[in-house]
Amino acid sequence: MGNGGRCMVEVVILLVLMAMSQGCDAQNTTGGLTRKSFPNGFVFGTASSAYQYEGAVKEDGRGPTIWDKFAHTFGKIIDFSNADVAVDQYHRFEEDIQLMADMGMDAYRFSISWSRIFPNGTGEVNQAGIDHYNKLINALLAKGIEPYVTLYHWDLPQALEDKYTGWLDRQIINDYAVYAETCFQAFGDRVKHWITFNEPHTVAVQAYDSGMHAPGRCSVLLHLYCKKGNSGTEPYIVAHNMILSHATVSDIYRKKYKASQNGELGISFDVIWYEPMSNSTADIEAAKRAQEFQLGWFADPFFFGDYPATMRSRVGSRLPKFTEKEAALVNGSLDFMGINHYTTFYTKDDQSTVIEKLLNNTLADTATISVPFRNGQPIGDRANSIWLYIVPRSMRILMNYVKDRYNKPTVYITENGMDDGNSPFISLKNALKDDKRTKYHNDYLTNLADSIREDGCDVRGYFAWSLLDNWEWAAGYTSRFGLYYVDYKNRKRYPKNSVQWFKNLLASSS
């Protein structure tokens, strides 16, 4: 999924609390939810990413990525697996498209592998990569399924990391722009919805602060986990370069392709909702601060031309500045907001210096601690992942927050879902009984529908994570988010109960 382990900067706290978590079975109930609960034209789809789905890492000229190197490094993936095969969608995409069509899905969100288009990140285009995505796009459209295409879902060509440390160098802005424009030229006549980046916040924090994602840079705990990196500066540099990359590409698209292709460009932001641990002023302010260091960090520049004032004051000179020209380029360059929302945490103020001394990172800069428990009680039922607690009400609260803070922007829910564990002791028959998942989607969608119908939020689509069980980054194959169960011995797909639930929802008209 987009965020596999997004809260791992607080992993020590979570592991201590994990044993206290409680679970309960959920019933498969629709609660009267139908397509008519949403506006005409509202889009339903599933989401995926190239690295988690495709496999075929050495086929048809694809170059290596930072995740290929990271996944093959001992100790980085919890089950010592890799995505060399993943769920083999590179060879099975026609089968998977039929699964989407059978459910009645309107759209499919997938990502393009940069290193399939440019094996070395720059230079000569790999025609085999262009051909593959043309086949995928055409096959989707032939079944009436609209492609929503992510240009960057974490799989940076390793060549660019080796050449100039990737997102830490401003050269990446130019190279990314060339890659993006190549995609506009090749696919833009049919692709009308582009997502330039998936969860840039997760990239900045997990890859350059905690070091738990590729390329695995950090300085927390005196470089105990990472050999290279600076957790106090690099996340902010990476974020800045990603924001400028989007703005640059948006400018290119609007000047050269918008008139003829009539598409839109957005970003998928990862957003945990934060509730104050208590009614104290300090905790209320802490929850606001945590959100500004998450969504505000990446969204505010596109709506206000700069980072939140809270970040400016707390991060100081370590937070890069936009020139006047850059601010003008960034401000207004977002056509829509993609929101990846899974869970909710309690947040409390923490003005102590312990975390600052131990970590000296973005978490320390927020002066907050976020956990899923209050007074020994979990904030909601837990899924399999230690960070994923089910709090459906937060979907509506979050949509209203986005509406109020950013003046009612166009929003797509580009990821939402929950996982089960991958246990050898659970039979296939029982693994397909995912009533907890159907309740999750029902309850989050119900709150989403209320935010649109009753609160006036401009939300235009919902993408479930995910169509298939898949390779979940640092969690490997231990986590199953799919509507379809995948047997990893032969990659065969089996429909879980949630598939029928979505079929019923999407076929309903009253």
Swiss-Prot record:
EC number: 3.2.1.21
GO molecular function terms attached to this record: beta-D-fucosidase activity; beta-galactosidase activity; beta-glucosidase activity
Record keyword Glycoprotein present: yes
Annotated keywords: Disulfide bond, Glycoprotein, Glycosidase, Hydrolase, Signal
GO biological process, one term: carbohydrate metabolic process
Active site: 199, 415
Disulfide bridge positions per record: 218-226
Family affiliation: Belongs to the glycosyl hydrolase 1 family.
Name of the featured protein: Beta-glucosidase 34
